[in-house]
């Protein structure tokens, strides 16, 4: 339960590490499809399920990738973003037998209007072969302050540029889901 109606959140904290360990220890069950099976049981209660996870390919992340339809891959310009995106694509390819419909869509984050950022964004759009959100998420100190304060961005700064950017991304995503 949260302060927001119709939204439930399972935080990515130490509980997930324990869940990963428990999944590994339960060798008699099919560990990699546990989340997909659990989500099927509650599918009437939710329109969407968003799982925030790190890049470490542990059992929890594998479960998420197998249950997912779409991976939104944040890309922050910093030197390793292209390699990280390619690694993610390879990891997803390894899971195609179990989840053949899983897609990746890149989301440019922490975007600045400098030459490097614009070059990476252009490469992603034109040469990378990755599907990409039209709206980039601009860099703003407000987003960092919101994270530090542990307050959701729209509550911390309702009219800020980053809140507006994320709303645009959500609208893009909802429009895509309707098609």
Which stretches of residues belong to each language-model region?
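Short clusters of hydrophobic/aromatic residues that line enzyme substrate/ligand-binding pockets
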Residues: 23, 35, 143, 153-156
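C-terminal boundary of histidine-terminating zinc-finger modules
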Residues: 146-165
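Hydrophobic "lid"/C-terminal helical patch
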Residues: 166-173
């Amino acid at each position: 339960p949260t302060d927001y109606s119709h939204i439930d959140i399972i935080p990515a904290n130490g509980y997930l590490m324990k869940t990963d360990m428990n999944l590994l220890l339960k060798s008699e069950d099919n560990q990699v499809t546990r989340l997909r099976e659990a989500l099927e049981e509650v599918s009437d209660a939710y329109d969407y399920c968003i799982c925030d996870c790190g890049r470490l390919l542990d059992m929890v992340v594998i479960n998420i990738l197998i249950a997912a339809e779409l991976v939104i891959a944040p890309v922050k310009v910093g030197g390793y973003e292209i390699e990280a995106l390619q690694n993610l694509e390879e990891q997803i390819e390894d899971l195609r037998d179990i989840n053949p419909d899983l897609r990746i869509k890149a989301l440019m984050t922490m975007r600045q209007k400098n030459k490097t950022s614009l070059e990476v964004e252009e490469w992603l759009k034109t040469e990378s072969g990755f599907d990409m959100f039209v709206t980039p998420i601009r860099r703003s100190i407000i987003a960092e302050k919101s994270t530090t304060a542990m307050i959701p961005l729209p509550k911390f700064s309702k009219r800020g540029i980053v809140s507006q950017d994320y709303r645009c991304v959500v609208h893009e995503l909802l429009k895509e889901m309707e098609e």
